[in-house]
Swiss-Prot record:
Compartments reported by the entry: Secreted
Propiece residues: 22-37
Protein name stated in the entry: U11-hexatoxin-Hi1a
Species, as recorded: Hadronyche infensa
Disulphide bond pairs: C40-C54, C47-C59, C53-C69
UniProt entry keywords in alphabetical sequence: Disulfide bond, Ion channel impairing toxin, Secreted, Signal, Toxin
Length: 71
């Protein structure tokens, strides 16, 4: 691979991994950019049928009506 190809892959992968690294409710707008089930949500992050929790966590409804990843 030449330098240009490596650079393109680096930029693309950097954008994807940056979205995965963001946490908190503010990151919800970025969730659509995540590719399928490739990324899972860690403990206490919001989840739904499209945003799965990391195993062995489960998506559970909390007191405020939202769903969060819990053991």
């Amino acid at each position: 691979m030449d330098v240009k190809t490596v650079l393109i892959f680096t930029v693309l992968f950097g954008v994807i991994s940056n979205n995965a690294a963001e946490t908190g409710i503010e990151s919800d707008s970025h969730d659509a950019l995540n590719i399928g089930r490739m990324f899972c949500k860690p403990l206490d992050q919001q989840c739904n049928k499209d945003l799965h929790c990391c195993k062995p966590l489960k998506c559970r409804r909390s007191n405020n009506g939202r769903k969060y990843c819990k053991p």
